[in-house]
Amino acid sequence: MALALASANSFLLPTKTHFALHVSPPPSKKTLLCTNPSSNFSFNKALSSRRRKQAWCVAAAADVKDATLLDGEEDQKVLVGPSSEQERKGEREVADYDWTEEWYPLYLTKNVPHDAPLGLKVYDKNIVLFRDGNDQFQCYEDRCPHRLAKLSEGQLIDGRLECLYHGWQFEGEGKCVKIPQLPADAKIPKSACVKTYEVRDSQGVLWVWMSRKTPPNVSKIPWFENFARPGFQDISTTHELPYDHSILLENLMDPAHVPISHDRTDWSAKREDAQALGFEVTERTDRGFAGWWGREKDGSKPNFLRFEAPCVLQNNREIVDKNGEINHFSGLFLCRPTGQGKSMLIVRFGATKRSPLIKLFPEWYFHQNASKVFEQDMGFLSSQNEILLKEKVPTKELYLNLKSSDTWVAEYRKWMDKVGHGMPYHFGHSTISLPEEPAVVEHAPAGLVAGLSASSPAKGGIGTMHAPNLANRYFRHVIHCKGCSSAIKAFQIWKNVLSGVVVALAALAILVSGRQWKVLLLASASLCSVGVYACSTAIAMNTTNFIRVHRRL
C-alpha cells in the first residue's frame, strides 16, 4: 500500500541513534556458479535447495551489456547482513513471548453488524463477535458446546446468540440460557457454556485478547497519537487476503516495490521513480523495531516507520507548510493472522489536513482503489507464501535482501527469530517452526469445504456469488464494509429502476405519434441508459478484480 503516502508521528519520533547494519561474509567461491542462461546448464543435484539461492548467474557479455558477477567485497556493499555483534558470532537472542498474551485487531467498530454474528479468526482459533441487547460487544469461541456447530452461522434473538442447529441460546459471559429440547422441569447443565474472549474498542478498532489464562493487559492495546489529534481524518478499509500475515507485513514495509508493482495506480507510483532508498534503524526491542527511511539521492529520511508486536505497522511523516504549521500524515496497517496462508488487514490512511479534492470522490472509490493495489501484489505474495512452505528453510537461505530496499524486511524476520518460538508457527531470518498441521488437504486449503458450504448470513452474497472466495474483491472487502455494501445496493436499485424507465420510455416512443414526443422520449431513454451503464460500472468496480495489462515499454 503506497507507503509514499505515509508520514512521521512526533509522538513516535525517538532521538536518532545510529545502529550500524553489518553484513554477513560472502558465500565461498565454491558455492558460486556462473553460466550463460541460454545454455543447457543445470544445477548440480547435490546442491541443497537451501543453498541454491547462492548460485549466481549472469549472462554473457555479448548478451547483456555491463553484466558483472558480484564478488565478496561488492556483496558486502549491497546485501543486508548481521545487525549486531551477537548475530555476527552466530549467537541468537531469544525473548519471552506468548502469542496469546497480545491484543489482535479484529474489526473496524463501525462495520460490525447490528443484526447478525460475525465469524472471525486469529491464527487457527475461530471466534464469533456480536452486539448483545445492550449494544455491547461479546466475543465467544465459534463453536456450540452441544455438537460443535459454528455459532457464527446462527442468529441474534433478543440480544442472545442462538445456534441455528438446535436452537441453544447464549448470552453474557457465555452462559447457556435456553435449550428447546430439555424437559420442562430440567435444568440447563453448567457445562453448556461457551468460552469467551475479552474485547475492547479503541480509536474505532475492536481488539481481542486471546489468552484465557492471563488477565487482559490493557496497557498493551496500541494507541496512535496522530489519530487522536484535533482535525485528524482518515479513510479506513478492511481486506481479507490469501497469504500469511508475515508475507503481508513484509509487503507493507517494502516501499521499494511501490513504483514497479503499482505503477500509475495513483500519483505517487511511477516506475521511473524506482531507486535506491536509505534506511536508518533507531530502535530494536523485543516488541519490534523503528527507524527512518527516504530516497538515498535526497540525502534525507523524512518517513518514520514503526513495527509493534504482534502485527501493527505504521508509517508516519510530518510536513511543515509555508505558514509553519505541521501537517501530520499516517499510514496505519493492522495485520491479523487468520490461519496458514490467510490474513485480514485494516488499513487507515489519514492526516490533520486533507486536500479539498478528496471530498469530490465517494469513499467507496478509494476503497476499490485500495482493493486494486492489493490485487496487483496478490499473485506474487501468494506464490511467495507457497515457496516458503515448500522449501522449509529460514528466509536468509532464500532471500537476497538489499540494504537499499529490504532493510525493514530483514529487521522483521530477525525479530521473528527472537519471538517465533512463542507463535503457532513462524519463518524467521535464521529460524523456522513449521505448523503442526498442514495448510492443505489434497488440492484444497484446510477449511475450504466448510467455508464454501457455509451460508454466512452475516456476510451475504451478490448475484450468483454466495460462497466466501478470497480470490474475489467482493468477498475480500465489500462484505466487511458497510459503506461499500450500501453503495452497491443503492447502485443495484438505481440500475433496476432506470432499466425499467428505459423500457417504459421506449414503449411510449413507439406508441406516440408526434415526432417531437418521440425524440424527447428516446432522448430521455438514452440518458437513462447512460445511468444504467454508470451503475453497472460502479458495481463492477466494487466486485471485479483488477487484471494487469502488459505493455511494451
UniProtKB/Swiss-Prot annotation:
Name the UniProt key words of this record, in alphabetical order.
2Fe-2S, Chloroplast, Iron, Iron-sulfur, Membrane, Metal-binding, Plastid, Plastid inner membrane, Protein transport, Transit peptide, Transmembrane, Transmembrane helix, Transport
Q: Which SUPFAM superfamilies match?
A: Bet v1-like, ISP domain
Q: What are the names of the required cofactors?
A: [2Fe-2S] cluster
UniProt topological domain (Chloroplast intermembrane) ranges = 514-518
State the membrane topology.
Multi-pass membrane protein
- What are its GO cellular component terms? chloroplast inner membrane
Q: Where does Fe cation bind?
A: 257, 262
From the Swiss-Prot or TrEMBL record, state where the protein is found.
Answer: Plastid, Chloroplast inner membrane
Residues of the transit peptide: 1-60
What does the entry comment about cofactor binding? Answer: Binds 1 [2Fe-2S] cluster per subunit.
Query: Which parts pass through the membrane?
Result: 493-513, 519-539
Gene3D superfamilies reported for this sequence: Naphthalene 1,2-dioxygenase Alpha Subunit, Chain A, domain 1 (3.90.380.10), Rieske [2Fe-2S] iron-sulphur domain (2.102.10.10)
Q: What name goes with this protein?
A: Protein TIC 55, chloroplastic
Superkingdom, natural source = Eukaryota
Residue intervals annotated with topology Stromal: 61-492, 540-553
The Gene Ontology biological process terms listed for this entry are:
protein targeting to chloroplast; protein transport
Signal peptide range equals none
Role according to the record = Involved in protein precursor import into chloroplasts. Part of the redox regulon consisting of TIC32, TIC 55 and TIC62.
Subunit info here reads: Part of the Tic complex. Interacts with TIC62 and TIC110.
Indicate whether Membrane appears among the record's keywords: yes
- What CDD domains would the database entry show? Rieske_RO_Alpha_Tic55
Where, by residue number, does [2Fe-2S] cluster bind?
A: 144, 146, 163, 166
